[in-house]
Design a protein with these regions (language model features):
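Flexible, low-hydrophobicity surface segments
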Residues: 1-140, 146-148
Length: 148
């Protein structure tokens, strides 16, 4: 049996500049180290839309986004290998709320958003403010959205 562990981003939004896995690959008991460039373009998802990268190859969009994977003989070796992976990031400004994302000039996290299947002809019920019945309430609400 092999153990799989993921190296996850410490940043809410960052470009991945370089991932050096050489030390992790050299560790005895490590069978495979994968980065986003190994699986670039492969996506998965829990619902209808498979839109999340298996491993990020160009940027991370939330704290905990997966950057690398290690397969090793045991959990301790896998953890040690993760600590040997050197990732260089360029930290970018994050978008921390839906209100911030709706501001004019807000940072665009998904430049290909208009091509995303999930927003093609969204149902009217997707507008939470309409369903409240009183648009005056909308200014007083905070929305908490949990990460994927």
């Amino acid at each position: 049996m092999l153990w799989c562990k993921f190296l996850r981003s410490p940043f809410a939004h960052a470009k991945i500049i370089n991932v050096d896995t050489s030390q992790a690959e050299a560790l005895e008991g490590v069978h495979l180290v994968l980065t986003g460039t190994d699986v670039e373009g492969i996506r998965h998802g829990r619902g209808t839309y498979k839109d999340e990268p298996v491993l990020c190859w160009d940027k991370v969009l939330y704290v905990g986004d997966r950057v690398a994977a290690v397969l090793a003989d045991d959990e301790d070796i896998a953890e040690k290998a993760l600590s040997l992976i050197d990732v260089q990031y360029e930290e970018l400004l994050p978008v921390l709320s839906a209100k911030e994302a709706a501001e004019p000039g807000a940072i665009i996290l998904h430049p290909d958003f208009d091509q995303y299947l999930g927003v093609k002809n969204p149902p009217e019920s997707a507008n939470p403010f309409k369903s409240l019945g009183n648009p005056c309430l909308a200014d007083d609400l905070d929305w908490n959205v949990f990460p994927q």
